[in-house]
Amino acid sequence: QLVTETVTFEDATLNTSGILTGEKLAEEVTGDTGTYKEYSGTFYTSGTASFQCYYSDQWGSPYTAGFTVSNNTNMETPGLGDQYSVYAKGGAKDSKKFAVGYYDSYNASQGKAGAVPTVTFSKKVNPLNIWISNSTYAFCWWTLGEGDMGGTIAPPEKVDAILSMRGYADGTLKKEVAFKLVDEEKGLVVDEWTNVDLTPLGWVDKIEFHFVCENVNAPAYFCIDDLTVATELNY
């Protein structure tokens, strides 16, 4: 018998900035820059799904990658300072909370698994669908051309920015579902929550979210909500 479950993020406890990161799970480590706090792993669990993140304050201020749960909906402010906002008035289907993903290829290459936005499952599931939108940071970067430091540059030429959702089972890549956050051919930047079919992934125990774009300066950010999966009862 198949049952479905949906991750809505509505039960997440957020801090005063309206986000949930791996900060409270971080432990002291000692590196070349001295002692700092760091965490890479699961920071939020809902049903069978566990979401991964990377957190560090090595450079004096909090740094996050992978997933962050958020309720930030500032659609006006460009730049990295607004990295936790979705370009929408709320989560999918008028909800309050959602997750922001940041694909940090550098820290992932350094063995920080949480730097790749990843969902692991406690048993095999068949993903059905997920809602996806751009973050405000990414949307403004593509449409306004605002630089990180507040300097205005011309909006970049629109090229495909693809969110590659890769399903794994027992460590083996099975299938991939691709969604265009920016569509070069249509000249469009996604500006609303969009329902994406994940059934081609089949039965998996992990989904990795990779950001793929030929413009290496493009913000590797995206937002997700309402991930629905099917699983077998007592599987």
Report residues per predicted region.
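Extended extracellular/luminal ectodomain segments enriched in beta-structured repeat modules
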Residues: S122-N129, W203-V204
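Long, positively charged low-complexity segments
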Residues: T118-F121, E176-V177
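Secretory/extracellular carbohydrate-interaction modules
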Residues: N107, G114, L128-F139, L144
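Short, structured protein-protein interaction patches enriched in aromatics and acidic/basic residues
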Residues: T30-K37, P155-M165
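Short catalytic/ligand-binding loop motif for oxyanion handling, primarily in non-cytosolic enzymes
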Residues: T16-G18, S135-C140, V216-A218
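Short coil-to-beta strand junction motifs in C2/discoidin
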Residues: W141-L163
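Terminal, low-complexity interaction segments
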Residues: E157-Y235
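N-terminal targeting leaders for non-cytosolic proteins
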Residues: L2-A113, S122
